[in-house]
Amino acid sequence: MGSQVSVDTGAVHVVIVGGGFGGIAAASQLQALNVPFMLVDMKDSFHHNVAALRASVESGFAKKTFISYSATFKDNFRQGKVIGIDLKNRMVLLQGGEALPFSHLILATGSTGPFPGKFNEVSCQQAAIQAYEDMVKQIQRSQFIVVVGGGSAGVEMAAEIKTEYPEKEVTLIHSRVPLADKELLPCVRQEVKEILLRKGVQLLLSERVSNLEELPRNEYREYIKVETDKGTEVATNMVIVCNGIKINSSAYRSAFESRLASNGALKVNEFLQVEGYSNIYAIGDCADTKEPKMAYHAGLHANVAVANIVNSMKQRPLKAYKPGALTFLLSMGRNDGVGQISGFYVGRLMVRLAKSRDLLISTSWKTMRQSPP
């Protein structure tokens, strides 16, 4: 798809809402094809949040995880918050009154969750980087740290802390017994547990934090008491929450109320078109596809959405998206990891080479056609 589109693009203007992994992949492809587009995001920089947890333990790392949109997309980027979509007039409505017309719309709004795993604030690049540098200082001050939530973010967070600061006491509290994501092979989930135990992480499984709302988050305190529903009490200096990921649906919720899945994702057909709309696509976390929410999948969705916009312009058949066997790599600190590729177990060496060392940062800088600092 590297050559430019030869049909008349005068009537075509694609608006992409959300500049996460799916959004920048779609924007880069449209730019290469010379298809008119506008990318909208409330931040001024792409956040490579796959590496967010390392940025919260290693000073100087965060600057590699934020990449300027305007340096890549120039006038095809608009910083702003989308507050609604006018389907009748084909307009994306921004806070402040601006309206962006579209012939085709790609919704790539992603998901939100607690800092440091996600950073979803209206912010400039410098302030975002500083938020992670401040987090590093809080972790460095704390001898005892509790991580709440044993999904992939929680286990990676605990592993990153123990890799960078092996002398710290880290306790991971998880409401279930198996760790990481339920779609993973049982042997992968077991290896996650063994890696954490080898690193010296204390595991409190099948327990739920009962006083979470009262606890300070991401800040050093001389004494914090964490209580669980089983009556366990843990004394700590710092609490990091790594659960509660939600789909970012506020931009489109009112326009597509009848097209929403129970979690707020958009119901799509096999071509990733929002049900009932041939010119509107949903990709990444906000698409209701039967697969885990991952950056890798968002990129695959972007390929299909862009191909289908081009195919529709050329009156060609549309391309269907077919989820494959699961590829999922868990980085457990820079020297360790485990996962599966196309449904098959892969161990430490492969994951370390493929992901753990640089957490795929170079891939995002390449997509954005910029050089890392």
Swiss-Prot record:
Induction: Expression is up-regulated in mouse embryonic fibroblasts by genotoxic reagents 5-fluorouracil and etoposide. Up-regulated in cardiac cells by anticancer drug doxorubicin.
Compartments reported by the entry: Lipid droplet; Cell membrane; Cytoplasm; Mitochondrion membrane
Substrates-to-products reaction catalysed: ubiquinone-10 + NADH + H(+) = ubiquinol-10 + NAD(+); phylloquinone + NADH + H(+) = phylloquinol + NAD(+); menaquinone-4 + NADH + H(+) = menaquinol-4 + NAD(+); menadione + NADH + H(+) = menadiol + NAD(+)
EC class (word): oxidoreductase
Coiled-coil regions listed in the entry: none
Tissue: Detected in most normal tissues as two transcripts of 1.8 and 4.0 kb in length, respectively. Highly expressed in liver, testis, and kidney, and expressed at lower levels in pancreas, spleen, brain and lung. Expressed in heart (at protein level).
Enzyme Commission designation: 1.6.5.-
TM ranges: 7-27
Protein role: A NAD(P)H-dependent oxidoreductase that acts as a key inhibitor of ferroptosis. At the plasma membrane, catalyzes reduction of coenzyme Q/ubiquinone-10 to ubiquinol-10, a lipophilic radical-trapping antioxidant that prevents lipid oxidative damage and consequently ferroptosis. Acts in parallel to GPX4 to suppress phospholipid peroxidation and ferroptosis. This anti-ferroptotic function is independent of cellular glutathione levels.
Protein name as catalogued: Ferroptosis suppressor protein 1
Lineage: Eukaryota, Metazoa, Chordata, Craniata, Vertebrata
